[in-house]
Regions:
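Predominantly extracellular beta-rich ligand-binding scaffolds that present long acidic/polar faces
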Residues: 89-90
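Structural signature of tandem-repeat unit edges
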Residues: 1-59, 69-84, 93-96, 100-123, ...
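Short alpha-helical DNA-recognition segment
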Residues: 62
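Conserved, function-critical positions that sit in or immediately flank catalytic
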Residues: 180
């Protein structure tokens, strides 16, 4: 599927933005590649109806997401002119919605001349490599080690990933607020012992002092879990089909 740019579109990001309607894209069931033609600078993925649009009155955001599940897109090619996503109220299409919209996505190509993003081993980073922006939903490989240069992980970077079983967080990462929602095969989160902000024990993610439980992997196969006595708060309620018993300390 090739997406063309807008002719005489104006000089603002909003006017130049090319919107991909996920419900319409789902009609191309056999398409494997989504390509943005030369001239496409700003992109948005429409994942919910417009407010006040009478044509969309009976359509919900959930309908758009159901359509996204039908897409077979495995690769997205952004044009050499691509600048960045347009931050519409549908959400940032790269930093928030990419995996949600494209569950079979394995590869993304972004020009080396792009000022905001780069792709390394099929993972999207900020241009300087200090922020991991998005780990693609269907990227092959069961394990991944975050590069030492990385300082930050985007909140949605590991949501809706389907093959990843273990991830290792490097010593310089400082992000505590990261979602691993719907990472159904993830069994283990490891953290470098040199990390000053995060820690892990038995594959579970905590803050360094282990006073806050940050993430219990969705694919961890233990049938029971005893929360450490040091834990005072939980940022995340375990969503795990294998767990039958959860032991909570008195305090």
């Amino acid at each position: 599927v090739v997406i063309e740019g807008k002719a005489n579109s104006g000089n603002t990001e909003e006017l130049q933005c090319v919107t991909v309607d996920m419900r319409k894209l789902a009609q191309f069931k056999n398409a494997k590649v989504l390509k943005f033609a030369k001239g496409v600078k700003y992109v948005a993925f429409k994942t919910k109806p417009d407010t006040g649009d009478k044509l969309d009155d009976k359509i919900t955001g959930q309908d758009y997401l159901k359509s996204a599940d039908k897409t077979g897109i495995e690769k997205i090619e952004f044009s050499s002119d691509f600048v960045k996503p347009y931050s519409h109220d549908w959400g940032n299409c790269i930093e928030e919605k990419l995996n949600q919209c494209f569950p079979k996505l394995k590869k993304v190509s972004i020009s080396k001349n792009n000022k905001y993003y780069k792709v390394s081993n099929d993972v999207i980073f900020s241009k300087d490599g200090k922020k991991l922006v998005m780990y693609l939903a269907n990227r092959p490989g069961k394990s991944y080690k975050i590069p030492a240069k990385c300082r930050k992980i985007g909140y949605y970077a590991f949501e809706n990933v389907h093959n990843l079983k273990s991830v290792t967080i490097s010593k310089n990462v400082k992000s505590k607020n990261v979602s691993f929602a719907n990472a159904e095969k993830l069994e283990k989160i490891s953290v470098s012992k040199k990390n000053k902000v995060l820690a892990s024990k038995n594959g579970v993610l905590y803050n360094k002092k282990m006073t806050t439980l940050l993430e219990y992997p969705m694919g961890k196969k233990n049938t029971s879990f005893r929360i450490p006595k040091t834990v005072k708060t939980m940022d995340y309620v375990p969503d795990n089909i294998f767990m039958k018993k959860l032991y909570v300390p008195k305090k």
